[in-house]
Amino acid sequence: MQFDYIIIGAGSAGNVLATRLTEDPNTTVLLLEAGGPDYRFDFRTQMPAALAFPLQGKRYNWAYETEPEPFMNNRRMECGRGKGLGGSSLINGMCYIRGNALDLDNWAQEPGLENWSYLDCLPYYRKAETRDVGENDYHGGDGPVSVITSKPGVNPLFEAMIEAGMQAGYPRTDDLNGYQQEGFGPMDRTVTPHGRRASTARGYLDQAKSRPNLTIRTHAMTDHIIFDGKRAVGVEWLEGDSTIPTRAAANKEVLLCAGAIASPQILQRSGVGNAELLAEFDIPLVHELPGVGENLQDHLEMYLQYECKEPVSLYPALQWWNQPRIGAEWLFGGTGVGASNHFEAGGFIRSREEFAWPNIQYHFLPVAINYNGSNAVKEHGFQCHVGSMRSPSRGHVRIKSRDPHQHPAILFNYMSHEQDWQEFRDAIRTTREIMHQPALDQYRGREISPGVECQTDEQLDEFVRNHAETAFHPCGTCKMGYDEMAVVDGEGRVHGLEGLRVVDASIMPQIITGNLNATTIMIGEKIADMIRGKEALPRSTAGYFVANGMPVRAKK
């Protein structure tokens, strides 16, 4: 089998590349995905409100676990990643948040990455998007990814929480992806107008999968990339339960889009990475790149939960006797409780003046429950998910064997810096202040978690150690740049090799201020044009907010 391009991983970036490259009818593409199809009849991945279900099993989730995290009471922590067509866009929380403009401007400070500034990237965010209320300078109107906005009257808690943020002195913003990210406001989501999850399998592959020049193989577990000297010339993988490898040749390039956990694993198994690590497993060294698998970053978050004094939360939706009606409303009408992910409001703030752009993110949820559906509070409640955005902590991903089925050693080193602890203490105290504003007086009951007895720095720190969880945003393990730990250049090409790129969240040099899916899709769109030799889309002229020393919040 021979193809022009072989793409490893049908996720948030891989599906973008597969779709854009096959727009050229003479270009042949093989798309390899270790998981299965995105079964459209499976409510677990298609119903927005069911977002916790895919995380509970292993059909759609790699269900990685970290090594014992030394600063988190040695907990082994969840590290869920999507498996199947759509990748993590098939199992994520569907929050469409691009990050802050200054995140990208910060990337572009590095020599060689100048064309990754916000205004250079904004046209690619727009290209990917169809927003339900139409296009403008910040949003697209005819892209593959369906984005919906929050509508008034969904749940009174959303507006009350936004109002409480304003009463605490923080700004309101009507578009967290528009002119100003900083502040509290409604949250856009990757959901179709018919109430279905808008993964990249639905948005991109649906338009491409019937093309004769695109071949899609599911249940295809990549073993390694094949090299001829320093050039990537093909891929070897295992199909289904087979132990006999299948091979295909890439006439032009191999495009690695397996994500922040799997992409460095595949490079390491293929002989690209830290020479000492590869020697440990008798893997012949193709090219030494010490940065492969390093620079691992994530967002850590915790839940502050409150009893709700009025019966307006989603608690009744958790009762089994209400679920058939909710399911029918969603299935036949694409409406009702099932048609929303219920992360319809949130915000970004600076916890201290020293931060030039927001360092704390909020997601508001009108029910008290863990993200993976566990530990639901058995009463009406609501919660804030809150966490820091740009932790200085760094971890790694390293293979444990040559077996592609064996999970790697993953260590985030969460909370390894004093800045982390200061930010989380600030976050808890600020959240409590917001939750005690007049806008929430009629709803707010007792504090369920952490509980009012948790007040001192030591008590807050212990709560974080025991209860903070991943926001499922790993990135950075094949970072873009030109220093000694960089893995790819500004076009995703692996340093020192030919015919090989990495295109996914692993190439982010620094984690962004917000959820990763939208930016991973943008990366796919931008590098697709580079691969095709197309001129970059014209740089945007849209304005964007810079705090520039403004106070963190207004004085009361």
Curated annotation (Swiss-Prot):
* PROSITE patterns reported for this sequence: GMC_OXRED_1 (PS00623), GMC_OXRED_2 (PS00624)
Q: Which GO terms describe its molecular function?
A: betaine-aldehyde dehydrogenase (NAD+) activity; choline dehydrogenase activity; flavin adenine dinucleotide binding
Protein EC: 1.1.99.1, 1.2.1.8
Q: What does it catalyze?
A: choline + A = betaine aldehyde + AH2; betaine aldehyde + NAD(+) + H2O = glycine betaine + NADH + 2 H(+)
Q: What positions does UniProt annotate as the active site of this protein? A: 473
Q: Which family does it belong to?
A: Belongs to the GMC oxidoreductase family.
Output this protein's name: Oxygen-dependent choline dehydrogenase
Native species of this protein? Escherichia coli O127:H6 (strain E2348/69 / EPEC)
